[in-house]
Amino acid sequence: MVKVGVNGFGRIGRLVTRAAILSAKVQVVAINDPFIDLNYMVYMFKYDSTHGHFRGTVKAENGKLVINGNAITIFQERDPSNIKWADAGAEYVVESTGVFTTMEKAGAHLKGGAKRVIISAPSADAPMFVMGVNHEKYDKSLKIVSNASCTTNCLAPLAKVIHDNFGIVEGLMTTVHAITATQKTVDGPSGKLWRDGRGAAQNIIPASTGAAKAVGKVIPELNGKLTGMAFRVPTPNVSVVDLTCRLEKPAKYDDIKRVVKAAADGPLKGILAYTEDQVVSCDFNGDSHSSTFDAGAGIALNDHFVKLVSWYDNEYGYSNRVVDLMVHMASKE
């Protein structure tokens, strides 16, 4: 059983904790968040507007957060180097504040006795791993890793299957992405990215994303062959990737469906899924897959030029991969 500490009890921190409880392979033993006190943690964990009421018990007792009878040590440190992870028995730390995303900043957790740190965001310099794509390249000399982004986790498994079977010459990705916490409820100031400051509930907002370029880091053969952008739309959760790419080998759309289904039923089971149903975004709320290929939504212009569509729960699917990555890392100890 992997003993885990969570730094930052936001959307991902809370859902990694939910996913950990369901997985029974990792145990959250400590949580740090300087902005949320213990009683508020109970409330935030218990009630979730997107994923519903927690189906278990959660209470505050003796200064700890007790979920389903398991007591979790609570810290409220602003400086990650001051968190005494070892005292709480936490060996792996999920860095989910969105703030400490570099090797140097995330490395502060090691000072408190953590053995490994998993950054739940893309990182400028930490090695990135996507389950089902390049997780086998992880080796135990690495103390700090990144689980990449939710969008990279959706795109990379699909890109891998297509590239392995037909070869991707080049491609452009668009993600139609649900609202996230960094956006504004109404128009407000937003640094250099002026569009990002516009009201999230009333606009379709074009935004940048490094998710497609990051695929080149986890699949080196695709480095420089993919880039992409995002449209932020007024939905609370679930996003969809549109990968438009040129294929090296000719392929009928039915050939593409066949290889994706084979991967979803085989080596990528649990990570990539396949559907021919007439689905919409809400149908994937609470889905634990990284990516669900929508066979009915894709189109082909010809045998070399296709548009492929894949859905993802950008909160819960991703949180499950964070747990899976920790389990995989622990298997290499």
UniProtKB/Swiss-Prot annotation:
Look up the signal peptide feature and give its range.
none
Tell me one GO biological process term: peptidyl-cysteine S-trans-nitrosylation
Kindly indicate whether the keyword Cytoplasm belongs to this entry.
yes
- What are the EC numbers? 1.2.1.12, 2.6.99.-
Q: Which transformation does this protein catalyse, written as a reaction?
A: D-glyceraldehyde 3-phosphate + phosphate + NAD(+) = (2R)-3-phospho-glyceroyl phosphate + NADH + H(+); S-nitroso-L-cysteinyl-[GAPDH] + L-cysteinyl-[protein] = L-cysteinyl-[GAPDH] + S-nitroso-L-cysteinyl-[protein]
Gene3D superfamilies with a match to the protein in the record: Dihydrodipicolinate Reductase, domain 2 (3.30.360.10), NAD(P)-binding Rossmann-like Domain (3.40.50.720)
Q: What are its GO cellular component terms?
A: cytoplasm; cytosol; microtubule cytoskeleton; nucleus
S-nitrosocysteine occurs at C150
Q: In which pathway does it act?
A: Carbohydrate degradation; glycolysis; pyruvate from D-glyceraldehyde 3-phosphate: step 1/5
GO terms of molecular function: glyceraldehyde-3-phosphate dehydrogenase (NAD+) (phosphorylating) activity; microtubule binding; NAD binding; NADP binding; peptidyl-cysteine S-nitrosylase activity
| Entry binding sites for D-glyceraldehyde 3-phosphate | S149, C150, T151, T180, T209, G210, R232
Q: Is Oxidoreductase set as a keyword in this record?
A: yes
Q: Which residues bind NAD(+)?
A: R11, I12, D33, R78, S120, N314
| Xref: PANTHER family | GLYCERALDEHYDE 3-PHOSPHATE DEHYDROGENASE (PTHR10836), GLYCERALDEHYDE-3-PHOSPHATE DEHYDROGENASE (PTHR10836:SF111)
**How is the subunit organization of this protein annotated in UniProt?**
Homotetramer.
Entries under NCBIfam families matching the protein? GAPDH-I
Write out the function statement from the record: Has both glyceraldehyde-3-phosphate dehydrogenase and nitrosylase activities, thereby playing a role in glycolysis and nuclear functions, respectively. Glyceraldehyde-3-phosphate dehydrogenase is a key enzyme in glycolysis that catalyzes the first step of the pathway by converting D-glyceraldehyde 3-phosphate (G3P) into 3-phospho-D-glyceroyl phosphate. Participates in nuclear events including transcription, RNA transport, DNA replication and apoptosis.
Q: Know the name of this protein?
A: Glyceraldehyde-3-phosphate dehydrogenase
Which organism is the protein's source?
Columba livia (Rock dove)
Q: Source taxonomy lineage?
A: Eukaryota, Metazoa, Chordata, Craniata, Vertebrata
Which gene is this protein's source? GAPDH
